[in-house]
Amino acid sequence: MSKPYFIPPIDEEPRMPGSEAELDPPPQWEPRYKGSERLKDKVAIVTGGDSGIGRAVAALFAREGADIAIVYLGGEEDADAAETKAFVENEGRKAITIAGDLGDVDFAKSVVAQTIDAFGKLDVLVSVAGEQHPDTDLGDITPEQLLRTFQSNIHSMFYLTQAALPHLKEGAAIINTTSITAYAGEKELLDYSSTKGAIVAFTRSLSAQLAPKKIRVNGVAPGPIWTPLNPFGGSTPEKLATFGADTPMGRPGQPNEVAPSYLFLACGDSSYMSGQVLHPNGGMIVNG
């Protein structure tokens, strides 16, 4: 390969994240309360902003006064991205959609360049996009799948953050998405869980590096959340049948129950927090 970037064959794995419009019941992603301008006139990049948690974050940030660059894979997800963009604009804010694969370093650079061209600045970087492929046996994880999962979940985070840093100033916030699997493990998601552990370490280490610049870096570790990721190939049918039932609350979470964690970490309410991870996971205790 001329560069460390792997494009999987079309028929190798289900395409992710899939269309949110096809989910039954539909996820709850719209903000549940009025905004209070906690992100007034800020500019945010939100990856995975077409659907799921990313869509809920983009919608809530817009309600709180931010303009949004919605980054997503493209293709089947175009309609979802357009709906997210329309919501942002209906909130009186500006939005652009940028489609492509963040595992490609050149695309990651392009995302930041397009955001700066459109809005002139960048205040908040939110990385949500990722993928997972269930395997019950370690031996079933191919080298291609391993590379692809790390490329989508953690390499992309390095690339996008590297591109964004020259534009982030004092008071900026970086928010990374890890997972409960980084703390509790998941026997059918060995490669995915490994990337999420790497994200925790990346978040803590980058926080230490950027603290002198007064740029905060935190993370969110969701539990089972009802998004397209699991129904569109990210979970086995057996797991999907009882998705979220093993949490103390006995149900999966909704995207708009997770988005406020990102808002808290993006705004001044969390001005004395960096290197931390919030755990919207239905009451599971992970001591992380």
Model-predicted segments: where are they?
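Canonical Rossmann dinucleotide-binding motif of NAD(H)/NADP(H)-dependent dehydrogenases/reductases
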Residues: 37-70
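Active-site helix of classical SDR
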Residues: 161, 195, 203
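Short C-terminal tail/terminal secondary-structure segment
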Residues: 23, 30-31, 135, 184, ...
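Catalytic Tyr-X3-Lys loop
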Residues: 123, 139-158, 175, 199, ...
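Residue(s) in the substrate-gating loop at a strand-loop-helix junction
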Residues: 179
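A glycine/serine/threonine-rich, flexible loop-to-helix segment
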Residues: 188, 212, 224-247, 287-288
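Conserved mid-core segment of classical short-chain dehydrogenase/reductases
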Residues: 3, 7-8, 34, 104, ...
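Alpha-helical segment proximal to the catalytic Tyr-Lys
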Residues: 166-167, 208-212, 271
